[in-house]
Structures are given as structure tokens and as C-alpha cells.
């Protein structure tokens, strides 16, 4: 998929029975993080969906790890903007395959991925037919304020990427 001139990597799993004569519904899977990464390998949840006839596209939108520091920092202090554009563009990418039913594309994710589900449904309501938010963050201000002091390095990393709740309240609400 690509958005705003940037190629966005991902992993696409095709159900065995999907074909141009029998197009499959599809889900865009957004990993947790932010800064996480979807990788090739076994995932019970994804395998379950594919076994039940869903195409699953695991997007590594801008801000994902594993593609260099520049790519990783492209969404710093801008979550729900271009990263959301990446996710919406992946729907168009999926609809381009004749073995995918372009009228039945949803979005699924947990943690940061769940936040992206909520953002897609709120800010791009026509993009997806369904959204599945698995324990997604819907209140970044509360989440960032609740990080315990013994998670200092992780807290600092999240503040750099998402914002400091003491100084970036307007953007985080």
C-alpha cells in the first residue's frame, strides 16, 4: 500500500478458498505499539481469521519499527494523522485484488492498533464496514499519566512519540 508518496509495507494472507469467483472479505490488522511491527510467522488470531475465510493485511504503517529510524519517527507527535492515512490507503490496496471483496473490508487491532480502529471509525467513517477494537487506547492523556515511575525509559519513549501529558494536553485530548 502507499499513501502520501510513501510505500507502506505489510503482510497479506489469502484464504485458500478465495478467488475472483469467490472473493473474500478482508481485514486490515494494525499492530500494537505504537512503534510495534507485524512480522511473518505464526499468529493464532490471524490464522484463525484466514482459516475462516478472511484475507488479513498486517500493515506496518509509518511509525512501525524495523524499517529504519526515519520511518519509525514519521508519526512522532502526529498519531491519527498520516498513520491513519496509511491504514485507510490499505483498504484501497486490498480492494485492488480480484480475490478480495472490496465492499467487505474491516479494520482490527489491539492497544495502539485498537486506537487506530477507533480513529478510523471516528475520522474516516466511510473507509471500513466494520471495526474491531481489541483493548485499544481511547484516552492517551489518561494512559500516559498512568505510566508508573519504574517504567521510566518506556515512559520517556512514549512521551517523545505521543507527547507529555503535562505539556501536550490539548493535543492528547
Indicate residue ranges for each PLM-predicted region:
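N-terminal cap/lid segment of alpha/beta-hydrolase-fold proteins
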Residues: 1-21
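Short beta-strand element of the alpha/beta-hydrolase
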Residues: 14, 21-32
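Short beta-strand segments enriched for Tyr within beta-sheet-rich domains
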Residues: 24, 54, 128-129
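Serine-hydrolase catalytic-loop signature spanning alpha/beta hydrolases and amidase-signature enzymes
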Residues: 32-36, 56
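Glycine/threonine-rich flexible loop motifs
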Residues: 35-41, 66
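Short amphipathic alpha-helix adjacent to the substrate-entry channel of hydrolases
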Residues: 40-60, 72
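Active-site-proximal cap/loop segments of hydrolase catalytic domains
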Residues: 61-173
Amino acid at each position: 500500500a502507499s499513501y502520501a508518496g510513501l510505500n507502506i509495507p505489510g503482510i497479506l494472507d489469502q484464504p485458500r478458498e478465495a478467488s475472483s469467483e469467490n472473493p473474500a472479505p478482508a481485514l486490515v490488522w494494525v499492530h500494537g505499539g505504537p512503534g510495534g511491527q507485524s512480522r511473518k510467522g505464526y499468529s493464532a488470531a490471524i490464522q484463525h481469521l484466514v482459516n475462516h475465510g478472511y484475507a488479513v493485511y498486517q500493515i506496518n504503517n509509518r511509525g512501525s519499527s524495523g524499517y529504519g529510524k526515519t520511518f519509525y519517527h514519521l508519526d512522532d507527535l502526529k498519531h491519527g494523522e498520516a498513520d491513519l492515512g496509511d491504514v485507510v490507503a490499505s483498504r484501497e490496496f486490498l480492494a485492488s485484488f480480484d480475490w478480495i471483496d472490496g465492499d467487505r473490508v474491516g479494520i482490527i487491532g489491539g492497544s495502539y492498533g485498537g486506537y487506530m480502529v477507533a480513529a478510523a471509525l471516528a475520522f474516516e467513517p466511510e473507509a471500513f464496514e466494520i471495526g474491531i477494537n481489541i483493548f485499544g487506547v481511547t484516552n492517551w492523556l489518561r494512559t500516559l499519566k498512568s505510566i508508573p515511575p519504574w517504567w521510566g525509559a518506556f515512559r520517556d519513549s512514549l512521551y517523545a512519540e505521543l507527547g507529555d501529558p503535562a505539556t501536550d494536553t490539548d493535543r492528547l485530548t
